Amino acid sequence: MADFKLADRLATLPPYLFAGIDKVKAEVAARGVDIISLGIGDPDMPTPDFIIEAMKKAVERPANHQYPSYVGMLEFRQEVANWYGRRFGVSLDPKTEVIGLIGSKEGIAHFPLAFVNPGDLVLVCTPNYPVYHIATGFVGGEVQFIPLVEENDYLPDLDAIPAATWDRAKMIFVNYPNNPTAATAPRAFYEKLIGICRKHNVIIAHDTAYTEVYYDENDKPMSILEVEGAKDVTIEFHSLSKTYNMTGWRVGMAVGNASLVAGLGKVKENVDSGIFQAVQEASIVALRDGDDFCRELRGIYRKRRDVVVAALNKVGIACRVPTAAFYIWAKVPAGYGSSAEFVTAVLEKTGVVLTPGNGFGTPGEGYFRISLTVDTDRLEEAVSRIANL
């Protein structure tokens, strides 16, 4: 059988972070070790019944078995606009400022195709979800990483970026609530970022998939589009995955500047065929009727967060108490040469799957990420195993 050479854009890629973790996990599981997976951010709880029932009804309609719209059903886009208005006080035109996505990852990965030419500079805040820089690299863009450090609350130091860099930049990727650090961004940060990007004509691509996983009803994460002037330069990516335990359904949305939304739509009409309409109809029900479920879900994650933070503190592992997202970003204990070394040792010796901080970028070295995606008993067991390593 012929062995064909990969294209350069693939051959030079590092292994995808979670693919490597899955490989080691499989090897350990094959030895009969009980695995507790706190690696990938995939909710362990099912999609709620009211969404599943809506899906069952939608699947039975023959009209939903045909090709869907590339940009999403107008009814779905209208419900996204309604939800944004209710949740964030943001007004959106569903016809021009909203587009449906086959999960937000799909939209983020395709977005640089619409606006980044070979050699264009794209700023990526790091540690980061790897898709931002990988998608940029696929289209020949030049990536400049902007470090996020604990001393600055994991916000980029915008003043440290020279004016000449802003002049060159075509786009900046930001992500709050942040994966992997669980940091949130205050209004003042967004105001400053928008001011700079409007001045230098830089596109803001904001990934905000975790806004509905927060722990204080009086401190809800905001949309960047709440800030005056944001629509001039911003597209915001959101998802139903984490909000309603729908990671496998592959449904999300991008909203904001009409020309940015249209550009992404131009790419999508040439590379995919849209979201299965039955999924869109069920998603309409989720967005319209899901507030009570989201409140209950936050309560579960709050208990899990508190259990893990207390357990880590008890064994002397330092971590910040997150106010949003279902991740704990903790410091690697002394005695390990790298976060990858620590995570590998934990997995091989205890069966607990963690994510090494350096897998998200150089500033993540010295940290590891815990996903709160198992029940409290298993979380306590996981930390106990780590403590006894």
Swiss-Prot record:
Keywords linked to the UniProt accession: Aminotransferase, Pyridoxal phosphate, Transferase
Domain of life, per lineage: Bacteria
Residues the record lists as binding pyridoxal 5'-phosphate: Y70, S104, K105, Y129, N179, Y210, S239, L240, S241, R250
Function: Involved in the synthesis of meso-diaminopimelate (m-DAP or DL-DAP), required for both lysine and peptidoglycan biosynthesis. Catalyzes the direct conversion of tetrahydrodipicolinate to LL-diaminopimelate.
EC nos: 2.6.1.83
CDD domains in UniProt: AAT_like (cd00609)
Modified residue annotations for N6-(pyridoxal phosphate)lysine: K242
Enzyme class: transferase
Residues reported to bind substrate: Y16, G41, K105, Y129, N179, R369
Reaction(s) this enzyme catalyzes, per UniProt: (2S,6S)-2,6-diaminopimelate + 2-oxoglutarate = (S)-2,3,4,5-tetrahydrodipicolinate + L-glutamate + H2O + H(+)
UniProt subunit comment: Homodimer.
Name recorded for this polypeptide: LL-diaminopimelate aminotransferase
PANTHER family: AMINO ACID AMINOTRANSFERASE, L-GLUTAMINE--4-(METHYLSULFANYL)-2-OXOBUTANOATE AMINOTRANSFERASE
One GO MF term attached to the UniProt entry: L,L-diaminopimelate aminotransferase activity
Record-annotated membrane-spanning stretches: none
